[in-house]
Every structure is written in C-alpha cells, then in structure tokens.
Amino acid sequence: MKKKLMGLAFGGAFLAASLGVFGFVKAETTSEDITPNLNVVRSIEDKDQVNMYKAVIDEKGYQNITLNFDASKKDEVNNGWTLKVYDENKEELYQVSGIKAQFTSANFAFAKGKTVYISVESGIKSSMFMPKGVEYNLNFHTYADSDYETENNNKYIDANEIPTGGAVKGSLLNKDDEDYFVYQIPETGYTKVSFEILDFVPSKILGGWNLEIYDKNKSLVYKEAGITKDVTLPELPLAKGQKIYIRIHPKLAVSTFAPVEIEYKLKVNTVKSGKWEVENNGSFKKANKLSGTKYANILNSSDEDFFTFKAAKTGRYKLSIDTGDNVKNAYKVEGFVNNKSKKAVSKVTMSDKSYTFKAKRGQNVWVRIYGISGNSPIGNKYSLKYKFVKK
C-alpha cells in the first residue's frame, strides 16, 4: 500500500491533493508523543498553529485515526481542520482538509515498531474561518491483524509474503499506490488466485484494479485488468518451488477513477496435480511430457505450450484438443514428427477438434499450442490428449 500523498473528501472535506500542498514536516516542528488507542484533547488557537503528534506502532495489523468534537460546537468549526500523516522520515503520506464532521481516516498498514507523525491544523489559514478554540478528540487506533498487508510494499523487493493457502487484506490509498506480494509454490499442480472486494461501494470502485502476476524474473505471466467485482483468476500451472509476484494497482492512475480506500482480500491456494502442464513449457526443449489427458491454458499473448511424447508403435495417431465452452478466441495447433521444422499438423480452432498424423515407432512427436495474434484465448482452460488409432 504505497500511501504516497493523498487528499480525500469526507463530508465537506476539501480535496487537497490536486493543489500540490504535500511535502515534509518542517525541521523545527516539535511533536508530542501519544499512545495508540488513547484520546488526545487539544484545540487550535492560531491560524498558523500546527499540532504535531508522534506515535509508535505497537502491534502488527492496521491503523486508523479518528477526529471528533462536541457536536454542539459545529457552528464554531467554520472551515474545519486539516489532518496529515507522515512516515518515520517525516515525508507526508496522507492529507484530508476541511474536516467539519466526525471523522475516521482510511486504514493504514504500518509495520510494528515504525514511527508515525500526525498533524492537525486549521483547514484554512484565516483567523475568520478557523475552528478557533474548538476542542477536538484525536485517537490513533491500532488493530491486531496478522492477515493485513504491511508497509512499504510498493516494490518487488518489499513485497509482502503470502503463506501457503493464505490470504491478505489491503487497500490503495491514492492513485499512485501499488501493493506487491510474493508467493512460493508449495506443490507442483495449479495455483488459484482470487480477489475479493470487502467494502463494495460502487461509487468508489470507479475504474477498478489491475491485478498482475509476474514470475521470478519479473516477466508478466497473467494480467486481469479493470476489476470491479470479485474475481478468480485462471489456474496458474506452476512447479513446486517457483515464485510469483502479485502486483495490485489502479487501472487508471487518475484521482477521479482510482478505487482508493476500498479494502480487498487476496487469497492464494495451490492444488497438487500431475494432470496439468507445468510452466515454463514455451519451447521444444522445455516441452512437457504428454501422457493421458493434460490440462493447460494460455496465460498471455506470448504464452506458448509445448508437449511431447514418443511413438510406441508405427501407425496413425489422433491428437484431440478440448477447448471447453464459449471460446471466443482461437487456438493454433501444430504437430511435429521427428522434425521440429516440419509440421505434420497446422490448424486453427475455436472448438473441440481431433487431428490425425502418422509416426513410426520410436519417433519423437511434439505439439505446440498458442493463441492467434490479437485473438488469443487468454485464460481459457483446454485439455489435450492423444491415442494410437491404427497401423
């Protein structure tokens, strides 16, 4: 959750992010130590006054801030308060201006032991419109939660680890926020990744999220763009020990379209299976052995699946591909017999098909399956098998 600088309206709160007012705490600014989960009662007496607080995260989980006041004083609040949050380096991460109602911030996910700075000041630098003398109650709440992301996880190197069969909750706090997670495959088979929207608020989901899967070399494996509802990704057929990175960020890095402050849950689970292809099988050299029925899918526009078997008898063989239901895009199916440069089969299909070819006993057979450029069946599960039909 890269909470780089943000302003968000709550009630009548003013969107300050667009004004470029973010920065750092001034070096001479002194801070008051506060204890998480205890109220601090203070007020602003001067238009230029800044009340700065310092808190240390006391447990792993998430945090938020409440700022409340006596409702009978609402007419004296005027343009309200501005609340800012800074990291341990005193770089501003979050800002909300024009707080004139009971306020609860977004959730943060700072690591245990980290220092956080919070400031409260007049929402507008004017003696006439400031909330002079109105006491506010400030509370920095911390909540224990072992399943919550931990800052800063906005780069590969800082990715949060997801345990086997585990889940993690997170959120994006601004248009530039990115969350990275890493998962190591515990068994050869297929891995399922699901994305659940915990706070389903259509007016805030807007353009939705992009969820991208990368391999250990940071090469794109699969991308789900514009997520606006719960979704489960296609099976990821990966080998034991392989590592994947999961990146979550706004589809559109524009304040008016980014799904900020909406909590999501990311779940990852691996099912052991010997019936699936094993990535990376994108070349003759890395072809998977074809024995019985193999399941596979095309995960991106450059993904190619290679399979191989050795002819046990001399005669005719039938290769069958089952593309499943409602396939809108096309597969290219190619077969090679003992010669990687000569095609014994070369067909395009959008439905279940069988192809026959001849092979002699002991000859190597390769099958290559990939999507047609611009019309690739990305994410669609298919199955492949062969059998000897006659001499």
Functional labels for PLM-detected ranges:
Residues 18-32:
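Sec-dependent signal peptide cleavage junction
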Residues 28-34, 51-53, 115-162, 179-181, ...:
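C-terminal edge strands of extracellular/lumenal beta-sandwich accessory domains
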Residues 1-8:
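Bacterial Sec-dependent N-terminal signal peptides
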Residues 89-96, 217-225, 339-348:
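Surface-exposed loop/edge segments in extracytoplasmic proteins
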Residues 40-60, 103, 168-188, 231-233, ...:
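Non-catalytic, beta-strand-enriched accessory regions in extracellular/secretory proteins
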Residues 54-76, 116-120, 153, 181-204, ...:
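Hydrophobic beta-strand segments within beta-rich accessory/binding domains
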Residues 77-90, 204-218, 328-340:
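Short, surface-exposed beta-strand/strand-loop-strand elements in extracellular ectodomains
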